[in-house]
Amino acid sequence: MFTKLMTAIFGSSNDRTLRRLNKRVAQINRLEAEFEKLTDEQLQAKTAEFKQRLAEGATLDSLLHEAFATVREASKRVLGMRHFDVQLIGGMVLTERNIAEMRTGEGKTLTATLPCYLNALTGKGVHVVTVNDYLARRDAETNRPLFEFLGMTVAVNIPGLPSDVKRQAYLADITYATNSELGFDYLRDNLAHSKEERFQRPLHYALVDEVDSILIDEARTPLIISGPAEDATQIYQAIDKVIPHLIAQDKEDTEEYTGDGDFTLDLKSKQAHLTERGQVKVENILTKMGLMHEGESLYHPARISLLHHVYAALRAHKLFEVNVDYIVKDGEIVIIDEHTGRTMAGRRWSDGLHQAIEAKEGVNIQGENQTVASITYQNYFRLYEKLAGMTGTADTEAFEFQQIYGLDTVVIPTNRPMIRDDKTDLMFKSEPEKFQAVIKDIQDCIARKQPVLVGTISIEKSEALSEALKQAGIPHKVLNAKFHAQEAEIVADAGYPGAVTIATNMAGRGTDIVLGGNWKAEIAKLENPTQEQIDEIKAKWQERHDIVMQAGGLHIIGTERHESRRIDNQLRGRSGRQGDPGSSRFYLSLDDALMRIYLNEGKLNMMRKAFTEEGEAMESKLLTKVIASAQAKVEAYNFDGRKQLLQYDDVANEQRKAIYEQRNYLLETDDISAMINTVREDVFNAVIDQYIPPQSIEEMWDVPALENRLKQEFGMELPIVKWLEAEDDLHEETLRERIINIAKEQYQAKEAMVGAEVMRSFEKGVMLQNLDELWKEHLSAMDYLRKGIHLRGYAQKDPKQEYKKESFAMFTDMLDHLKSNVISVLSRIQVRSQEEVEQAERERQAHAEQESSHYHAEGEGQDFSDLHIGRNEPCPCGSGKKYKHCHGSKAKYS
């Protein structure tokens, strides 16, 4: 009550921010007349002037008004578009490291030019982050003429680019890239064997488009680069045969309740658990198969991997459905993104789940991979010096953006009032009844020539609805993961009078649905259109546009509520752009997943009884509250999951940063001999301490064991026993000093044989190779620790604190191993000539390159030839030429 009163008097935080920024908009507007008088050359010279002023100590904020006025004027001349005042506000919000919520159709692409230009003046590079290759290419080509007019270089970074092209892309002032490619390039840079192989500069400013999709929906997806591990194909096939013998149980066993099933399912977290009865049954089956010995337990340390396979197979069979979570395409399992409905070619589930699904579907089982490098989007984007984002739907997740990324959300007002009619939800008893009502609504729209976009939550649902529409004789197009290649074309046609388009979730997001159809797309299909053809296309479009406007604009039908209100708002947001008319309605049933999973059986039964007739629809405020309550539960559950992930990943992140800093130092430094000398002393002191404890008497020493250790580990044959017999005054300190000095002298003798330069290169190579190998093993160990740490909760211990403590101990142990391994290799290496060392170094590099050639990045793309690029589309390499005149011509003749 008090908060509402204060807001009524002083306005909300958002209102106060907008009032402050409106004053700055007025200052930019006052410059417009002055900048209109400038010649093109004078306007272009502003870039050099701003850079000079920055070099002399000016701040970006002090240049903002003039820089924005420059971009606005250049846009009018080059693109024929003038930034609205609300777009100037959006640009300032993005400059101030915030998230701008701008409704669909309000011109986010043009708004982005303002902060991009301003931040690019520093010369440190700007990354504009998009969710897919198509949007990266499209936005870069849209804004390229404007940026190049102002003297800025523009490039595109997408999967499949040659290394030299990718390196050039990162050197551009403004680089458009996909979120996954940026993350993978960061990981690849930290697997590079020389500084010349790296791609990225220090991360300066990132502007994330569709920020909610990248920083929230994909936050729990780690970016992983992996290499091949041992083959376990036969085990996956054997375990797959076990699952049909197991029976599901409704709930977990407790002291009061013991079920008669073998496993339970947690639908929220998509996890499966064996009951005690199920464990015994599985052990008996595996023993008969010869995979276990009589009397052995699945929880025996030697059999834990089998338990891991059983759980993966259970999840594959009982929790992951074909055409919902994945599709089978060309004999491979292709994941479907649950948030966008798009396929994610190249991505694989971890923890053996992908192989278990391959076994279930009877396709070729590809080998498991070992993690070589990984990072989450949460931690990658927090590496940027400045981070900002924009989307049409962020306000519902404002708390999470602030908590995790420190980003405030500012809702930008629309340029024209929003007049879309959002109708109340209709609830039906069953799915068939709901589909009948949807078909009736679609038929009404077609009769008045109103285009309809129907949103579904999965491929399975979209195909079921498509089948129902076919039976009703309604022509329509389906936009889902199976038809990804035609996505832009289907979206372009979705605004035609009476057009019916079914879309999974937010497939096609980022592309506006233009009422009457996309006339620009029609013109783009023509090779060299004449002015007469262009005028004819525009005239026909205007006729169609008027028909659609009169019919009520684009009508949105949601066939199911999503887990998140934000995704529902995104679907609605496709209609009513820039003051256009539009309408939306959600059709629900008690069979919907949201209802079944998040409402208890009592509530569902009560709601079923409320329906008295078949086909009856329920419409009430109470219903809206029930749905909102279910969605709030899911959002809270998902937020908690992302927060938990971050808390655990933050531990690994500190270690990752330390290792990558050390690695970068090694790549940048030619001479690490001082480091090697320090490490040598540390290692020898640690070894000697084990056999000759500090400040101890001679009777406590184990000299023969020390002699043996020095020989085995460092190739040093030292007669320490004889020294002690011959020299009475040889005490602990002098003995320690002598051993370390001899080690140094032997090493210096080797260096004299091959030369200092070769030895420095060899030291660096050995250090890098050991660091990479041990870090890879450490990542696997951390994965295992993370998976089992929750069990500490049963011992009344805080799992997070235990994870921190144990992972730190593991990290310290890894560093000790690194030091010991490096000194051992450098001490034992036998060199007779410079040529031998150079040959050893060449072999080491060849081995490293061979290993890296097997690395696989989840979500990595393909070569240009597989990207389905139109001949007249811009080339994805970022050259600015048409594809047919650039890499397209090379592809044609290669």
UniProtKB/Swiss-Prot annotation:
Enzyme class of the recorded protein, top EC level: translocase
Location of this chain's protein in the cell: Cell inner membrane; Cytoplasm
Amino acids binding ATP: 87, 105-109, 512
Alphabetized Pfam families for the sequence: P-loop_SecA, SEC-C, SecA_DEAD, SecA_PP_bind, SecA_SW
MF term (GO), any: metal ion binding
UniProt entry tagged with the keyword NADP: no
Protein's name in the database: Protein translocase subunit SecA
Taxon lineage: Bacteria, Pseudomonadati, Pseudomonadota, Gammaproteobacteria, Pasteurellales
Gene behind this protein: secA
